[in-house]
Design a protein with these regions (language model features):
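Active-site recognition of the HExxH zinc-binding catalytic motif
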Residues: 94-112
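Structured segments of extracytoplasmic/periplasmic soluble domains
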Residues: 19-28, 108, 112, 129-132
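Metalloprotease/metallohydrolase-associated module, dominated by Zn2+-dependent proteases
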Residues: 65-66, 76, 83-87, 115-165
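Metzincin-family zinc-dependent endopeptidase catalytic domain
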Residues: 11-96
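Acidic/histidine-rich, surface-exposed loop or edge segments in extracytoplasmic proteins
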Residues: 1-7
Length: 165
């Protein structure tokens, strides 16, 4: 967690990350992936970072975007503003946080953005749910009913909200 972030419990953040990535509905649930937490000084395939919106802009290569999170190389960058406040169209903050982690880790695992496959159905985790649902319902998990949920490849032309809240 970046120095200077206040009112976020670093231990709880770490527990939430570990629980989300170990959940049977997550990327490891169908046995295709194995994820393991390692120590601070041990080699890692990727690192989950909780950053301020300004640092997110720098690490993600787009200083004008202080709203979204990203994956850049082996860094999964979680914007603390999204972690704390979520987004207006997803009312369950815990589920939104699970989505946020699974979506950005999905990029690290090689997955691209997807579109909503069926109005009224759950959104694949690789839909940019931070920006909109496009007829789908919020869904934080790569697996639904034990099966991978995917939509057509691509993304919507949603505007990125201004500001960092």
């Amino acid at each position: 967690m970046e120095d200077g972030i206040r009112n976020v419990d670093v231990e709880r953040f770490a527990r939430d990350v570990a629980a989300t990535l170990a959940d049977r509905r997550g990327w490891t649930g169908d046995g295709r992936w194995r994820l393991q937490r390692v120590g601070r000084d041990d080699p890692a395939d990727f690192t989950v970072l909780l950053t301020t919106p300004v640092t997110r802009g720098r690490l993600c290569g787009d200083p004008s975007d202080r709203y979204t999170s990203c994956r850049n190389g082996d860094q999964v960058v979680i914007n603390v503003a999204r972690w704390v406040y979520g987004v207006p169209h997803v009312t369950d903050l815990s589920r939104y946080r699970q989505y946020l982690l699974n979506h950005e880790v999905g990029h690290r695992l090689g997955r691209g953005h997807e579109r909503c496959p069926r109005a009224g159905g759950p959104a694949p985790v690789m839909v940019q749910q931070t920006l909109g649902l496009h007829g789908c319902t919020p869904n934080p998990w790569p697996l639904v009913g034990g099966e991978p949920l995917a939509g057509p490849s691509g993304q919507y032309d949603d505007p990125i909200p201004a500001g960092d809240r």
